[in-house]
Amino acid sequence: MTSYEKMIHILHNKDFELLEDWVADDYFFVFESQMWTRDEFLERMKDFFSRSEKASDFMFEEKCLYENEDCMNYTRLERQEDGEMYRVVGMVLKNSDGKIWRSIERITKVEVKNDTN
């Protein structure tokens, strides 16, 4: 299973155990201007899994842009809690054990066009 396939499996199956095993001890996650340690990230993901709907209900057009043994770059559309649609772009760096070591994501609001003609 590639790292991208593993990430998709974790998100779509709410596989917290696999996520916890995959995250390196010295991991941190940067989202826009916020940063979380491994423990903070895992706590947020546990909360997210417990209260979220199926990933396929709010994640669309998921795509791996690039992957090798050191990194993975991906994008997707995601409907946020505010109901707006955003383009998520992320980068994951892996350590020599293949665990995720650093992650960064940014989001950009996407204008959804409604054709009512």
Report the location of each language-model feature.
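Short, well-ordered alpha-helical segments enriched in acidic and aromatic residues
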Residues: K14-V30
